[in-house]
Amino acid sequence: RGGAGPGAGSAEARSGVTSGASSLSVLGRVRAMAGPRRGRLALALLLGSLALGSAVGLMATSGWLISRASQQPPVLYLMVAVTATRAFGIGRAVFRYAERLVSHDTVLRMLADTRVAVYRRLERLAPAGLRTTRRGDLLSRLVADVDALQDYWVRWLLPAGAAAVVSAASVGFTAWLLPEAGAALAVGLLAAGAGVPLVTGAVARRAEHRLAPSRGVLATRVADLLTGTAELTVAGALPARTAAARKADQVLTRIASRAATATALGDGLTALVSGLTVAVTAFFGAQAVAAGRLSGVAMAVVVLTPLASFEAVLGMPLAVQFRQRVRRSAERVYEVLDAPEPVREPVEPAGAPVSPFPLRLAGLGARYAGQDRDALADLDLTLEQGRRVAVVGVSGAGKTTLAQVLLRFLDARAGTYTLGGVDAHTLEGDVVRRFVGLCAQDAHLFDSSVRENLLLARKGASEAELRDALARARLLDWVDGLPDGLDTLTGEHGARLSGGQRQRLALARALLADFPVLVLDEPAEHLDLPTADALTADLLAATEGRTTVLITHRLAGLDAVDEVVVLAEGRVVQRGSYAELVVVEGPLRAMAEREAAGELLARA
């Protein structure tokens, strides 16, 4: 979990990315990302202006040189222009290369800090804060939307700034040669650099606003398709899901096509304005030459300078589209950064207790963000060292919410939660999770070896310790029978293992971590009844003497625990030993009767 430790906020500090409400606009917050790197961006702007200025200077000087050379003056008279032409030609390439190097290096460093900030925010939000978020959409925000932020700098702000500088210089130089030509160039550059982008921006606005969300939808469809191919095939739903992915792709293609139409419109209008401006300046130049106010050599400069000047504004229509695109991507990124945290880390954490015992919940209530009803209410629970408690109830009773509160994945909104007499909310989340561990029903197995999956729990564990954990999880005989033993690959999400083997490997990992308190959240879920009951019995045997909270909706094996707590709609409706509760009228007995009837039906 991110956010713990003194360096947790360093990426946010470097990038200027902060969570929470902000008085800045979305694009204002993107600009704030520059932070201490504004000097390097100013250097990139200067280099970009010099590159464009060199292009204009090259065209103007070349025009003057060719026109003057046609008069066959002494060669030495042309040497300054020849040298300037060479300097502008070399400078154009050198300044452009330097501008790209400085701007991209600076912007990519900002993106790296931003991506780290987003990832750390996701760590703080997970798992309770991401309950309604799709994985594909999260991936799109973390990768594509963060990447899109670079376009604000390298395809909008820096090009627009360089275009403004070079346009002003070109207009000033042309007006110095011929005022009316300078005025015509000013009108043309204003039309191409501001008017055309406004038109194309209006045309593309709706498409650009929909582009990032549509990209997220496609990513979600593809992620679901790739991760659930086997299940979709078995259920016969693969064609429908494939069609949904194709439809999302077609929608994204149509949106991109509309944006491309606006780009083409902008290119065409810019070329038209450029041609008209050059024609007008040529007309004014011809009149000035006829009137004797302008030399024929200067006439070439008056005509060619506007032609080169339009290179500065040629990309402005596309730049405006990128600005619109960045705005929507930035909104999606800041939706993550501004999302309320389900857990608040203490500003000044308390010292960790020597022992977490007794672990005590008193009058505890918890609610997920956006819900109007408590998922847990008025819950009391005390765990002494070695005590084992089973929490049972139907789906939605609040069992998993209890697990999340115990691990501080979700903070209680009422009541108290203490570890060894210390308020858990005054401890860092990582400290709580060193005392309380989880073996979840959907524990993730990485696409690596059995050994590497176990070493996640304790990096320096010896071979003997790994084998001991596997033995306690009743998995050692299976591992010893594998050709590669501990180095056997498990496959993605443990695909090469059976359901029971995956759960046992997850249990072995939790046992290896040696948590003082171990929470087993529906460890036998998704298994057939005989396998589930056998696994539950083995889990209880493996945790003998360890403080354990077993969360389950199955009752098999619960006579081995010290207390059974029955939840319904987030409240405790019955508690006591299994032997006491199963013989009296109440929710547990009703559950036992339904379970027995289900087993009889299954055998039949």
PLM regions: where:
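C-terminal portion of ABC ATPase nucleotide-binding domains
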Residues: 1-20, 24-28, 537, 545, ...
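Short cytosolic helices in intracellular loops of multi-pass membrane proteins
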Residues: 108-128, 135-139, 143, 209-251, ...
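An intracellular "coupling" helix at the cytosolic face of ABC transporter transmembrane type-1 domains
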Residues: 30-39, 127, 131, 144-153, ...
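Transmembrane helices of ABC transporter permease
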Residues: 44-50, 158-210, 283-294, 311
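Helix-loop-helix
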Residues: 63-84, 173-187, 262-331
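ABC ATPase nucleotide-binding domain helical subdomain, centered on the C-loop/LSGGQ "ABC signature"
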Residues: 416, 451-491, 537, 545, ...
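Helix-to-loop junction immediately C-terminal to a conserved catalytic motif
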Residues: 407
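ABC transporter TMD-NBD coupling linker
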Residues: 306-370, 411-414, 418, 461-469, ...
